[in-house]
């Protein structure tokens, strides 16, 4: 069987849809997560579902149910393009190795500085983008953590949601 992610990505080519994830779950569920720059609409999910149903049938992909949805507000970030796209947004990262006894950091993602101008020793990550994360170490003490994608175990958007609404 061909790589399911690659097959799905190929099937969605030209649809202005970004494939975020393909996951097999219990009881034959095949979960496909998509995104668009201007947000995922229900019509996008319907269109992708119809397209993938046909492709998966032709390719003999075994599944009982197909679920197509958006990544939600806490969307995972997996590659450099996604990190660049969400620069300026609040994210949460988990480092592979603890830093000052801490692995999980939340803050504002900074885009990489051009040509290694960060002042970091670039020998370990030669040619790799060095991103920054502005976080509050202590109250009113903003620090910047520099990292490459190899330094992190996982990352996701971490928006601050206000459920109180406007007061009238």
Swiss-Prot record:
GO terms for biological process: ribosomal small subunit assembly; translation. One of its GO terms (cellular component) is cytosol. Pfam families: DUF150_C (PF17384), RimP_N (PF02576). Keywords: Cytoplasm, Ribosome biogenesis. It comes from the Bacteria. Gene3D superfamilies: Ribosome maturation factor RimP, C-terminal domain, RimP-like superfamily, N-terminal. It is found in: Cytoplasm. The keyword Ribonucleoprotein does not apply. Required for maturation of 30S ribosomal subunits. Belongs to the RimP family. This is Ribosome maturation factor RimP. It comes from Bordetella pertussis (strain Tohama I / ATCC BAA-589 / NCTC 13251).
């Amino acid at each position: 069987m061909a790589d399911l992610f690659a097959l799905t990505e190929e099937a969605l080519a030209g649809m202005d849809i970004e494939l975020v994830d393909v996951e097999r779950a219990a009881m034959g569920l095949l979960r496909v997560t998509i995104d668009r720059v201007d947000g995922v609409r229900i019509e996008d999910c319907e269109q992708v579902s119809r397209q993938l149903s046909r492709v998966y049938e032709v390719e003999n992909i075994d599944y009982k149910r197909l679920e197509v949805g958006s990544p939600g507000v806490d969307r995972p970030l997996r590659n450099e393009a996604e990190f660049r796209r969400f620069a300026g947004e609040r994210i949460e990262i988990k480092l592979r190795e603890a830093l000052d006894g801490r692995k999980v950091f939340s803050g504002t993602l900074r885009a990489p500085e051009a040509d290694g101008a960060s002042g970091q020793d670039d020998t370990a990550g030669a040619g790799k983008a060095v991103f920054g994360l502005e976080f509050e170490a202590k109250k009113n003490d903003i620090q910047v953590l520099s990292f490459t994608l190899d330094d992190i175990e996982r990352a996701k958007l971490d928006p601050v949601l206000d459920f109180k609404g406007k007061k009238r």
